[in-house]
């Protein structure tokens, strides 16, 4: 029965992944128009460093992804320009990939699979070691993305195209 649940879960993930790909393909021209200066972040993977980023500049609007319905999460990711994830990445992490398909620039760390460019194909200037000396650099990057979203989102093209072109069984 446990195996059946895993298979069900994989089927749901495959369907969800395809749904997100289709949402992106159908809305890729509209998505930039929906964007606001918001940073969404994975609250379940939050740590002291995330809270240091949030507290560094109180004028930035950070919204946690926690306790949201699928529709609420979709709406948040469609509005936010940035998805921040400084948790541990156990593999090809689903959350950053989905956030990217909803038009978010992904800022992450080097933990787990995020240390491997092939798994988390985010340019290195969007990846940071969790050191307090990097807070100013992260803050500057957030404002750079806010002020020039289109250019910065283009830097995610390799990661985005990789996600859009992979088969479902490649991400398991």
Specify the residue positions occupied by each region the protein language model found.
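Short, contiguous strand/loop micro-motifs
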Residues: 60, 82-83, 115
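Short alpha-helical donor nucleotide-sugar binding micro-motif in glycosyltransferases
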Residues: 75-80
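Catalytic binding pocket for nucleotide-activated donors in carbohydrate/polymer assembly enzymes
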Residues: 86-88, 94-164
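Glycine-rich anion-binding loop/nest that anchors nucleotide
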Residues: 64-67, 83-91
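Well-ordered, non-membrane alpha-helical segments in soluble/globular domains
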Residues: 48-49, 135-141, 170-172
């Amino acid at each position: 029965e446990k195996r059946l649940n895993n298979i069900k879960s994989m089927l749901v993930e495959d369907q969800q992944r395809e749904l997100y790909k289709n949402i992106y393909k159908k809305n890729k021209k509209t998505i930039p128009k929906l964007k606001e200066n918001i940073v969404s972040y994975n609250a379940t993977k939050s740590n002291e460093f995330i809270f240091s980023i949030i507290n560094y500049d109180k004028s930035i609007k950070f919204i946690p992804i926690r306790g949201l319905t699928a529709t609420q999460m979709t709406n948040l990711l469609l509005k936010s320009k940035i998805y921040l994830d400084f948790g541990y990445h156990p593999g090809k992490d689903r959350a950053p990939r989905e956030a990217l398909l909803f038009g978010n620039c992904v800022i992450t760390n080097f933990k787990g699979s995020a240390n491997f460019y092939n798994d988390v194909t985010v340019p290195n200037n969007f990846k940071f070691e969790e050191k307090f000396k990097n807070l100013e650099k992260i803050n500057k990057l957030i404002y750079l993305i806010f002020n020039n979203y289109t250019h910065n989102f283009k830097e995610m093209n390799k990661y985005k195209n990789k996600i859009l072109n992979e088969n479902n069984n490649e991400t398991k």
